[in-house]
Each structure stands twice: as structure tokens, then as C-alpha cells.
Amino acid sequence: MTITEAVAVMEEAIETVVGHATEAQTERDRQIAEDNGAEMVTGTTAPAKSTPTQAQTEAEKKAERLRKLQAMKEKHAQKEAKEAAVTAGSTRMLLAEMDQKASGTPGPNSPVAGAMSPAPTSPAPPMPYAGKFDPKAIAKSSKAARPQSPTRLGDVKLAAPAPKPLGLKKEANLKGAGLLPANRAKSSTKRKIDMDDEEVIKRKLVKLPDFVPENADSTPDAEGEGEEEADDLDLLMAQNEEEMAEAHRVLQERRDERIQKEGMAMDVDTETPNGETKDEAENEANVESKDEAVLPAPSMDVDEDVDPLDAFMADLEQTGSAGGIGSVPARQKQKAGKGFEPEAYFSDDDYGYEEDKADPSSILAMASKKKKKDIPTIDYSKIELNQIRKNFWVEPQELSQMTEDDIADLRLELDGIKVSGKNVPKPVQKWSQCGLTRPILDVVEGLGYEKPTSIQMQALPVIMSGRDVIGVAKTGSGKTMAFVLPMLRHIKDQDPVTGDDGAIALIMTPTRELCTQIYSDLLPFAKALKLRAIAAYGGNAIKDQIAELKRGAEIIVATPGRMIDLLAANSGRVTNLKRATYLVLDEADRMFDMGFEPQVMKIFNNVRPDRQTILFSATMPRIIDALTKKVLREPVEIQVGGRSVVAPEITQIVEILDEGKKFVRLLELLGELYADDDDVRALIFVERQEKADDLLREVLRRGYGCMSIHGGKDQEDRNSTISDFKKGVCPIMIATSVAARGLDVKQLKLVVNYDAPNHLEDYVHRAGRTGRAGNTGTAVTFITEEQENCAPGIAKALEQSGQPVPEQLNEMRKAWKEKVKTGKAKDASGFGGKGLERLDKEREAARVRERKTHKAEGEEDDFKEEETAEDAAKKDKAKSAILAAASAIVSRESAKADASEAKPLPAAAEGAVKGGVTVNAGKGGALDKAASAISEINARLARAGQLRPGQPIDNKGPDAGAFHATLEINDFPQKARWAVTNRTNVAKILEATSTSITTKGNYYPPGKEPPSGSDPKLYILIEGDTELAVGKALSELTRLLREGTIAAADAESRAPASGRYTIA
């Protein structure tokens, strides 16, 4: 059959498909109608006309779709006929190419497989097919033609398809018309098969023509995609083998073109055996012909008589024999003797990561470093810092005209201001002279501040000039505004905070309450100047504060502990102090009194060196002068009213009472206070937290509304308590010294020191909660005769404030000084803070003890404690005591022998007594002394044959062991005695040694000897059949006794609990 005849047969088959489909549909409709009629006869409940009507409708739809398909095909055939004259040469070229492929001998000028070829076109309209369409007959004729194919197995070539189709419409038209299924245009991921042992070449599998069984039913389905697939299958079956391969070539070309247009990720860059990409091979194929290394695609030119798998395997063998080293792609190299080595994408090696070796020392060092919360150290010498402006002070003309005498008189009038330093600016007298901006002055006027206070008059010009300042002023004198107003001017002069920049101003306070109060005072100014401020203190979730810092802030008000947490969080990436140029310590002296010096110094060392530092407090003892020299540079010291002085507006009353009369006197004071005015507040200070809760219950029982606040309460409770106290919800508040700093309540008229403060600074701050901002108040202090240590501070405060000192209080002060002189008592200033390192050590020691207690049997310790001199002394003491208590192992035969014949303590027991180290007893030093002590004990026991004078050794019964030893435990601590008599420990020793352990004697208190004729002191008798068993048991008992003794000594040396709470 020639190519022209094949084209004619294909067109006739298309015409026949349409007619056959119409007849088949009509036959199905008739069958459905007959079935529905049978159902009506048998009495079914379905309507009689519904099904035939529906079948007719479906038949009409099917017929309409087939008519549209036929019209499209006719239009396409007419267009091809018009192009036949133009493409006649191309058609002849295509026919010649197909004839050459069928004969197996390529012509001299034939194009290489893979080059672009025009699509087949029919030169004339098809002739009608006179016969009946029979798919089975067509399949049989196709099968009969297969043996005549000249293509051999070895001649099958695989090559990439041609890139472009010519003269045909896009595949979307065929799919929309129902010729192609919707999912056929989608390409699945190509699987790559490795069946070669030496070389691997990446190949792409192409879908082969659909296999149609000979007895397949060609009746199209009536639903969805089944109809389209049936029509397409009928179309393919109506062709011969060569035309079928050509049709698949066209479909593959259209599919590739659509994929390229849609940008789908397909493997179109597959390498050829020569190392070139497919596109490069195709471009070269258009210029010159290639050798047979370039193989045609199996889905285009492979005859159906060759099995696809056989063709693929044969092609692999041919390529493997012809390929060289260069044919193996770089990403699919194969190791000798091994399978295919996959390539890792997005590997850690691509980024240069290197895994550190698991060094235990480095892991422990890293763990301890994370636990320590170290702040990243910043070396400012290697950082180029921007220059900042700190001096904003311009002296007004009014002040410049004042003489030195005028300035001295002015300072004397302003509560006796004292300044020290070089070139101290003159004090101002009104807000307009301070050099503040207009928005700041508007807020000041809105808050009702008419004129500056004494400390503000002198501190504002000094701070505005950029100098470091130490400010000491009485409580309630406006110290907060003295450092806040210059801070705002300092911040506005610098660039805005952006990105990861830290804050410009940092204010640190010792208590959370003072932190919140300063923050609330800042808010009106920050809002007016569009600045952001953050209050960072403990008790609240740190994640919220970190989130605020991430958004950026110019001002941070914080406590030292929480500030260190923020600086150390995430290895210092949360915030930093690189831009912090204004640093304030409010109530600075109390920070160091509370033990914050290490934390404060860490923060100071992390701030840039050209900062401006301001220290403010109501008390500034000389003891912290050394600190100020470390952190300040040429400071100006300002004192208003002297150091540690109670304001003159406060009336101070000191009463010496017994402990039982304090509460009655407190009720009298409260009754007198609220008899005159109901809208007043009273603040009661106590020493301990449990005392605050106990006093709260007693006051509530008397009908007074009150609340308590102390460090043991949650921060939210503390905040709400202070808020309610200020609003008057609860007019009485009971607190520890945690509320003695920064608490500012205008209606506070009475302060009661229920428990007297133990040093001057605490007393000044407690009394300073009242009489603030020019108001009057009363401070009453209860002191007992036993509290002589509190008398010196209270008496000094009365003297400095110009108030009389009670005679009895003066006598108590003298008595205390006499005790200090004679050495019976020790005076303490209150500044004994050493940071939190001591607490960390105590927690670590407790953790080690807990791990030892809960350690599983046989588990080895994974930590090593550092033995101090104190620990060594405890072990030596326990060792000597055990040496004196343990006896030698004596047999029944030698019980009455001479002391020189007694057997010494075996090496195992002696090693246990000496701390687990066994040595020869002949060496000098302390070991000789221990050996001589053991010999003396053995000699005494063996010579007399008695445990104690007058007491026989009681292992003479019929069941007594051949060897025995004793261990006296009467004079050891209770923990040690319990360790060697505990049933669990004894049972383990009995099981391990097969000995008998008996506790005998009576317990006598330390220092008491047993009377004559009574039982001896408490001891343990160890009996066994062999000397080795008795020695092993004695060794274990002495080890337990030594550990118990050391544990008891540790418990005694530890400081007792704070006593704030007790467990009932």
C-alpha cells in the first residue's frame, strides 16, 4: 500500500467513524427504550416517558457534537487542499523520507532524524469508503502487515522529537472538539532507569501508542472523558502503522510546544551521548547530517512489530558499547563496584558548615556560659562612634550678671545648696532659663509645675552642660524631673532610632515600683515629643518587653536584673547599648545596698565611654564614693539639705514599746488619723514578709480596709495594690521596705515603722514617703529595748533633722556603742551586697546534693565537685572520728591474746576510713598517726577482751561467727547513725558480704558516759565466717558513716533559711 492510498484510507475511516458512531448511538437508544418498556410491563414505579425522553435528548446531543466534529474536519481538509499546491515539494520530501525509513536505507540527501519535518497533507479530497467500518478487520490487516516490516531490533534508534509542527493547529483545538482527552496534554515526571554497570546516560521515556486488543469493543461510552477516549481510539485504529506513528509524532510535537509556552518544568535539556544538550543537537542537525549516534525517538519511528522493552534494552547495549568516558554526565558518575551515587541538593556542605567535634569540655563550657547570662562585650576602640552633643547650656543674661556673693546667697536661700566641682553653672530661678524646647515647656506648664524646686534649679543647668552629676536631695524634692527634662533635650538632638539601634537613654532603679512610677512620669513628655519609652522589670513576661524593644525605643526604664536579661537574650541580638549616651541611676545608693553592684557594673562596662552619667538619691553614704570614682568623670556633686536627712516638713515620733503593746498603739494612731479626715492614707512598714501578712489579718479583723505588698507577691498583685492605695480603695497599706523607694502618694499623712529599720538610709526613705512636695506628714517609729542596733541610726536622723532625741533612745545608742567597742556586737552599715553570686553557689550546691540523693544504683557521677579547704577539713574530721570508733577484726581464738598479736584493720576497711585511698602504714606523717591510733584501739580491745571497761564482747554464743568487728556510732550525728542503721543499706551489705550486722548498746547524749554496770554506747557488731567478709562489711559501713558525717557538717555550716516563711 502506497502512502497516497494510506492517506485516502485514513480519511475514509474518519467518515466511517462518524456514521458508525451515529448508528451505535441509535442502536443503544433503541435498546434502552425496549428495556424501559419491559420494566413498565413488570410493574416498575418509574415514569413511563421519562427514560425514553432522556435517551432521545442524549442522542440528540451526541449527534450534534458529531456533526460539529465533522464540520471541523471538512474545514480542515479544505484548508489542507488549498495549501497542497504550495507545499507539494514538502509533501514529496515527506513521502520520500517515509519510504526510505520503510526500506531501511537512508538516501544521500535525506534529513537526519530529529530535524524539522512538515506535517502530512492530502493532495485531494478523500474518496468515500464503500465498505462497512470494522475495527477488528482493520486490526487483523495491521497484524498481517507486521512481519513484512524491514526494521530490525538492532536498528531501533532513540532521538529527541522535532521541536515544531508545520501546518497544523494547536492541540487545544483537538482536545476541545473531543478528539483528545484533557489529561493527555499533561506530562508526567520522567523516570530515569539505571541498568548499566559501567556508564549511565540520562534518557527520557516517551509514551508509546495505546495498545488496542483485537477483540476490543469500539462502542463509545456515553459519559465524560470515556466518549472522547473512544473517539480518539477509533481514529487511531482506522490507520495503518506508519500513519499511526506519524500521528503520534504530531501529537508529541504539539505537546512539547505547549509545555514550552506554559513554562512547565520538564527535562528538555537532556544531554546527548556526545555531551551536548538536545537543543544544540537539533540546531546542528539543521545544518549538517549526523552519524548514527543520534537516535530517533521510539514513539515516532518504531514499528509496532518490535516490543518496546526489547528495543529499549537493545539500544542500551548499543550505546554502552559505543559510549566513552565523556558520555557519562558529571552528576551521575558511578563509583567502581558500587551502585548509582545520588547527588545531595541543598546540602549543608554547600554553605561551608563544619560540625564541631563533641568535646565534653567544650560542651560543659558552653552550657555554663549560657547559664551565666554573660553580656556580649563590646570593644568600642574598634568601633567608629558618631560624635554626640552633650552641652546645651547657654547662660542667660540675667545669671551672667550675678556676682559670686549673689550666687552664694541664692544657694543658701534654696535650702542650703552645696556644690563641689570645677566650673559649676549657676542655679536658675525659672523654667524659661533652663534652655528647654517649647513642647517640653508646654507639658511642664500643663502638669502645673510653677517653678523649679531647689534640686532642679541647680541640677538642670549642670546636666544641660553635659557634666556627670551626683545629686543628693530630700525625698519628694522633684529629683525625677531634674534628670528627665535634660534627657529629652539630649535625645531630640540625636538621630532617630532605627532598625537594631538600642536606646539612647537608660534609667535604672532598684525596685519595680520606682521603675513604673518613673515610666508613668515620662509618658506625657514622650507623647508630646513622639518618643518611645519602655518599662522593663521583673515579674512580667519578658517576651512582651522584647517585642517592644524590637519595635525600637529611645528610653528604657529598667531594673538591673531584667536589663541584664534583655542584653544577654539571644546572644545580645535583642538590644544593645551602642547608642546609649545618657545613663541615670535613681536611688543609686540603695542599688549597692541591695547587692546590685556586679549587675550595675556589667551594664556600665557595656555602655559607650563618652556617655553622660547621673546619680540621684535621697541618701548618699560615703561608702559608695569609691564607686562614683569608677563610673563618673569629674562629677559635680549637688547636695540639698545634706546627706541622708529627713525633710523638715515631716514630724518624727519615736516610741520605745514592748512587742505586745505595738499593735494596740497602732490601732490608737489609726483611730486618731481617721477621726479627723477619711480621705487620708496610712503606710505601715514591717521587716519580714510573713509579718506583713500576719499584721494584715489582724488589722482586717479590727474593721480597717487594708492591703499588703512585699517581694513575695506577684508583680501584678503589687501593681494593683499600689494603684488601689493611691485611689483610696484601701486607705491602709502594710509593706516591707520594697515600698520605701519612689512611692509617691499625695494623701499619705502617716507612716508607721512597726518594725524599726536597722540603718539610717532605710529610715530616711521610709519616713520620706510622707511630707512630699511641701506637704506635711508624720512618721512614727516603734522600737523595743532589744533593738539596740537600730537606735544609732534613728537617733542620728533625729539629730540631723533638728528634732529632739528621746532620752531612752539615747541610752540605747550608748549601750550599743559599748557592745561594739568590747567586741560583743558588730556594727553594720547595711551596704553588704555582693551580688547574686552567693545565691548561685547555694543553688548549685543544692543541685549537686539532689543529684547525689536521686542517683541510681551503679550510676557514675558525671560531674566533679571542687574540693575546698573547708571540705577537706570536714573529711579529715570525719576520718579521725571513724578511726577512733572502728575496731580491728578479731577471731574467737585470739580474743584473749596480747595486743601485739591482734590483727590490724584490713586494707579495705582502712582505705574506706581514709577516704577511699589504701596506702602502706609504714610511711611517716599523718598516716603513721592514723596507723598508731588504730593499733592502740586494737591493742586495748584484744588485750582486755572487752568492748568497754566492765563490758565483755558479746560474740561468744554458739552461733557467733569466726571473726567479728565493732563500730561505735553513738557520738556521730543523727544523719550518720541513720545511714548505717537504715534497713535498706544494711540489707544491701548483708546480701553482698553474707555477714551478720547487729545494732547493740544504748544511745547516750554527747558528753555523757555510760554508768558502771549498764549497756555500752550505741555500736554495731559485725560477724562473719571469714576475715575478708567481715572486712568488706566494715568497709561499707565506714563509708556510709563518713558520708553521713560530712553531710551533717554541710547542713550545719549552711546559713539558715531567711525565716520569712515556715511550713506548718
From Swiss-Prot:
Residues 665-813 form the Helicase C-terminal domain. GO terms for biological process: mRNA processing; RNA splicing. ATP binds at residues 473-480. The keyword Zinc does not apply. Residues 22-63, 97-170, 211-231, 257-305, 320-346, 820-872 are annotated as: Disordered. Residues 42-57 have a biased composition (Polar residues). Its main location: nucleus. Residues 835-848 have a biased composition (Basic and acidic residues). It is found in: Nucleus. InterPro entries: DEAD/DEAH_box_helicase_dom, Helicase_ATP-bd, Helicase_C-like, P-loop_NTPase, PRP5/DDX46/KHDC4_KH, RNA-helicase_DEAD-box_CS, RNA_helicase_DEAD_Q_motif. GO terms for molecular function: ATP binding; ATP hydrolysis activity; nucleic acid binding; RNA helicase activity. Pfam families: DEAD (PF00270), Helicase_C (PF00271), KH_12 (PF23469). A motif (Q motif) lies at residues 429-457. It catalyses: ATP + H2O = ADP + phosphate + H(+). GO terms for cellular component: nucleus. Residues 460-638 form the Helicase ATP-binding domain. Residues 220-231, 858-870 have a biased composition (Acidic residues). Its EC number is 3.6.4.13. Belongs to the DEAD box helicase family. DDX46/PRP5 subfamily. The Q motif is unique to and characteristic of the DEAD box family of RNA helicases and controls ATP binding and hydrolysis. ATP-dependent RNA helicase involved spliceosome assembly and in nuclear splicing. Catalyzes an ATP-dependent conformational change of U2 snRNP. Bridges U1 and U2 snRNPs and enables stable U2 snRNP association with intron RNA. This is Pre-mRNA-processing ATP-dependent RNA helicase PRP5. It comes from Chaetomium globosum (strain ATCC 6205 / CBS 148.51 / DSM 1962 / NBRC 6347 / NRRL 1970). The gene is PRP5.
